[in-house]
C-alpha cells in the first residue's frame, strides 16, 4: 500500500490550490475545488483511511453520485495553507449507495466539513457527467479578480459577456467556444445557487457568479485551471482597455468565425450575433 499524501490526486490538489492562491483568486478561505475519483484511484491508499469513517448527510439526495469518490477542499480552509497541511485542508469522501450522505475516509484531521459549496459542486458534477459522458471530473470555483470586476460594468447577458471575452484574447474562442453562463446574484452555499449553476453547466463549461466569482469544469485539474486562467486573462485585458479609453478596433465577427473553423470548434451562435 502507498501513502495517500504522495498520490497523484492529493499532489494535484496541492498544486492547483497553491497556484490559485498565487494568482490572487482565493483570498482567506475563498474558493473550492472538487475532483471526482474512481475506486481504482483510491484503492492503493486504503491503509491510510480512517477505520471508522465519519458520516454526514447531504442537503438533498444525490442518487446520480451513488458510490462516487471525491477529493474536495475543506470548508473554512485557506488555500495558502493546503501545501503546508494537506491532511487537514483536504478530504477524501465517498457518497453513500443511496446518495443521501457521504463518509469521510481521509483528511480534515482537525475536524470540519467539505466545502460549503458541496451542493453546487455535486449538482454540477452530475450535469457534466451527463454532458461529457463522464469525461469531466473537476469542478473549480474561485474569486477571479477581473472577471468579478467586469460583472459590475458589463451587461449580465451570456452572449454579450462571452463576446467581450472572445474579443479580449484570440485564444478565448478556441478554449471556451461554448461561452460563459451567468446566474443572478444569489446567496452562496445554498442548494438554490447550486441548481442555477448546474442548469448553466448544461451548456457552458464556465459559469459566472456576478460580484462573487467563477465556476469552471474540465477533465483534469489542469484543464479547469487553464480554462479559468484564460478567461481571467481576457478579463484583465478588457479592464485595461476600459482604463485606456475603450476599444478603437477589435476582432470582427468574420474573424471569429474563421478562428473557429481553423481550430475545429463551433462558437456559441448567439455570441457571434452580438
From Swiss-Prot:
Homotetramer. Its cofactor is Zn(2+). InterPro entries: Aldolase_class_II_sugar_metab, Aldolase_II/adducin_N, Aldolase_II/adducin_N_sf, Rhamnulose-1-P_Aldolase. The gene is rhaD. Catalyzes the reversible cleavage of L-rhamnulose-1-phosphate to dihydroxyacetone phosphate (DHAP) and L-lactaldehyde. NCBIfam families: PRK03634.1, rhamnu_1P_ald. Belongs to the aldolase class II family. RhaD subfamily. This is Rhamnulose-1-phosphate aldolase. Pathway: Carbohydrate degradation; L-rhamnose degradation; glycerone phosphate from L-rhamnose: step 3/3. GO terms for molecular function: metal ion binding; rhamnulose-1-phosphate aldolase activity. Its EC number is 4.1.2.19. Keywords: Cytoplasm, Lyase, Metal-binding, Rhamnose metabolism, Zinc. The lineage of its organism: Bacteria, Pseudomonadati, Pseudomonadota, Gammaproteobacteria, Enterobacterales. SUPFAM superfamilies: AraD/HMP-PK domain-like.
Amino acid at each position: 500500500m502507498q501513502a495517500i499524501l504522495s498520490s497523484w490526486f492529493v499532489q494535484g490538489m496541492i498544486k492547483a490550490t497553491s497556484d490559485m492562491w498565487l494568482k490572487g483568486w482565493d483570498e482567506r478561505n475563498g474558493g473550492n475545488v472538487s475532483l471526482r475519483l474512481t475506486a481504482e484511484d483510491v484503492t492503493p491508499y486504503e491503509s491510510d483511511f480512517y477505520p471508522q469513517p465519519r458520516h454526514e448527510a447531504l442537503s438533498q439526495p444525490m442518487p446520480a453520485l451513488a458510490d462516487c469518490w471525491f477529493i474536495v477542499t475543506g470548508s473554512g480552509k485557506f488555500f495558502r495553507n493546503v501545501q503546508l497541511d494537506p491532511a487537514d485542508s483536504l478530504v477524501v469522501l465517498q457518497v453513500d449507495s443511496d446518495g443521501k450522505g457521504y463518509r469521510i475516509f481521509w483528511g480534515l484531521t482537525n475536524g470540519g466539513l467539505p466545502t460549503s459549496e458541496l451542493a453546487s459542486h455535486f449538482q454540477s458534477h452530475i450535469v457534466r457527467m451527463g454532458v461529457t459522458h463522464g469525461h469531466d471530473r473537476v469542478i473549480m470555483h474561485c474569486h477571479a479578480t477581473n472577471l468579478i470586476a467586469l460583472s459590475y460594468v458589463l451587461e449580465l447577458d451570456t452572449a454579450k459577456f462571452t463576446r467581450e471575452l472572445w474579443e479580449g484574447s484570440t485564444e478565448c474562442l478556441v478554449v471556451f467556444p461554448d461561452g460563459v453562463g451567468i446566474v443572478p446574484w444569489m446567496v452562496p452555499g445554498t442548494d438554490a445557487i447550486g441548481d442555477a449553476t448546474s442548469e448553466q453547466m448544461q451548456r457552458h463549461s464556465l459559469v459566472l457568479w456576478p460580484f462573487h466569482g467563477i465556476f469552471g469544469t474540465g477533465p483534469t485539474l489542469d484543464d479547469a485551471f487553464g480554462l479559468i486562467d484564460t478567461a481571467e486573462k481576457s478579463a484583465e485585458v478588457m479592464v485595461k482597455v476600459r482604463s485606456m479609453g475603450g476599444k478603437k478596433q477589435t476582432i470582427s465577427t468574420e474573424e471569429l468565425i474563421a478562428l473557429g473553423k481553423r481550430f475545429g470548434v463551433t462558437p456559441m451562435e448567439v455570441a457571434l450575433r452580438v
